[in-house]
Amino acid sequence: KGDVVQELRKACDKYGLKFGVYLSPWDRNAECYGQGEAYNKFFIEQLTELLTNYGEVHEVWFDGANGEGPNGKKQEYDWDAILKTIRRLQPKAVTAIMGDDVRWVGNEGGLGRTTEWSATALMPNSYPGSDEVYKRLGINAMSKDLGSRELVSKASDLFWYPSEVDVSIRPGWFYHAEQDNQVRSLANLVNIYYRSVGCNSVLLLNIPPDKRGLMHENDVKRIKELTEYIKKTFADNKVEKGNRIWTAKVGDTKEYKVRKNTLVNTFLIQEDITKGQRVEGFTVEVFANGAWHHVGEGTTVGYKRLLPFSDSHAEKVRVTITGARGTVNISNIGLYYAEPLVDKTMKVTLSDVPVDGWKTVGMDAAAAIDGKQETVWKTETLTPLVVDMGKEVEIAGFSYAPAQEEDLTGTIYKYNFYVSRDGKDWMKCDATGEFSNIMHNPVPYFVRFGKTYPARYFKLEPVTEINNKAVTAVGEIGVLLK
């Protein structure tokens, strides 16, 4: 019914927005998925259509997901041909994630690294030989260190490959009506802004369209609040002559005057990245009440670094370069005041049935049913988790939350789910059997069966772990009634 892409193109033109397309390489519904050349031809034809029928395209975004198709095969992609197609048809377009212009930060929680190098040893994984480079250097997209001197000294090539932090405004990436009141708080989004844009990354904030094809009112309200907050906070730089280029070396210090009678609590520093990224360390002091006070320090700067600190009536600010790769080129220094926000942290409801009174059967796995995602039940085997809810309910689905920590070992990828009325006779529920993309998106997953099952007991049986290890980890599990 019409051309959705064309409608979006026209809307972008109307409101002065740049237009990009997201085409997932992981089209497991295609009959030819997993058939190598046949699927690559099919995919490039789709890409060609998108890049020739809708005017200028500013970005082409590919996710890194890649699982088995219905035929049990994984697709081998011809990335060289795919990227050449983009450069031929849309030479100015940025290619992201599986492209070679912007890389994935390594998580989908909205958190950038505190040390983030755009000049990195991480070869784009669409390049031939990237797997061998990762193995030799001991790195991947999720590694903490992607650009230290030690790592760079071992690398044969360096890449200008800036980081993108992607996160959803809701608990998941797609629209669900039951999450209408689980939109991230303004305080949470501002923190994400500081941890992404303020840590030398770009921010991709996902806002899923609802069943009307519109952004839900709650999402729109929050986005407007975020926009106004950022505009208000960074509209007026209190530092005098902060935008003059400062060429410095290690040990150099520069003082800036601050406008009189102003309250500040946020420091900004930027490098002239047309000359590269060179700062490895810096400190910040403010002069207030007749003395200098240390208010912050950081490692990398890059395009932008933001440091919040306690409210201060600063008269001057002093910046010292403590580490660098040659001469650094600072393009901007700023001080701002950010209004304090109270974080009413969004609460994700994982179970429609209260977990009070639940018991695990055959083992002590209380951490999996205590209502807290931050506590984790982990065992060094692929062990089924059996729960007695204490009473019979009509189960329509279940939720699984992986561990909310950096170490994702034990996260379940493929599973079976069973229910029982007596704890003896078990029925296997009709479910997809896998938490697709959970390795890259370790958020709570909600599985709905499409019908209900009467049950007092349920069992989650892990079949494979994300890295094929014999470990099981559950942050929390719940049941759904609708």
Enumerate the language-model features and the residues they cover.
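Mature catalytic domains of secreted/periplasmic carbohydrate-active enzymes
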Residues: 1-282, 286, 294-309, 320-332, ...
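Generic hydrophobic-segment detector
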Residues: 186, 190, 361-362, 465-466
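Aromatic, loop-rich ligand-recognition surfaces of beta-strand-rich domains
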Residues: 218-228, 233-347, 366-430, 441-482
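Surface-exposed loop and turn segments in beta-propeller and other repeat-based domains
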Residues: 434-437
